[in-house]
């Protein structure tokens, strides 16, 4: 739970640095631009982003994103858009990224825009039945 006033303080801090907030249309336009890289980061705790997030978003908790920007956003002069759902993590993260010289924006998604991430099925079967291999396949046993 967010402490009373935390979201307002975080928003005021970001606003004081003139960090713009994008609506859904502006975000779509940025992400659709083939001439400029735009990163979209979910600044929430991973336990939140694993339940529902925005399509194309990368989970990057705010502190980790700030500390490992070269890992998360390796393209020079790229734009960064950060979002959360409680209005605390994203503004604070955006503020730090702004101070580091990044072109950064905030986004507050509508709850209906958040979707469950795709479920990845893991198959730990180690072998493939011979019948499943194409007749013309060449099998090389390196073990």
Regions found by a protein language model. Give the residues of each.
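Rhodanese-like catalytic fold shared by cysteine-dependent sulfurtransferases
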Residues: 1-39, 43-143
């Amino acid at each position: 739970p967010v402490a009373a006033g935390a979201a307002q303080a975080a928003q005021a801090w970001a606003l004081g640095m003139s960090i713009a907030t994008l609506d859904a249309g502006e975000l779509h336009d940025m992400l659709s631009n083939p001439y400029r890289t735009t990163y979209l980061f979910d600044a929430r705790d991973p336990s939140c982003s694993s339940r529902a997030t925005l399509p194309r978003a990368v989970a990057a908790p705010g502190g980790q994103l700030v500390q490992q920007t070269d890992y998360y956003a390796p393209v020079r002069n790229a734009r960064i858009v950060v979002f959360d759902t409680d209005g605390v993590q994203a503004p604070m993260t955006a503020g730090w990224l702004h101070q580091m010289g990044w072109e950064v924006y905030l986004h507050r998604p509508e709850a209906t825009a958040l979707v469950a991430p795709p479920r990845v099925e893991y198959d730990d079967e180690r072998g493939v039945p011979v019948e499943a291999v194409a007749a013309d396949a060449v099998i090389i046993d390196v073990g």
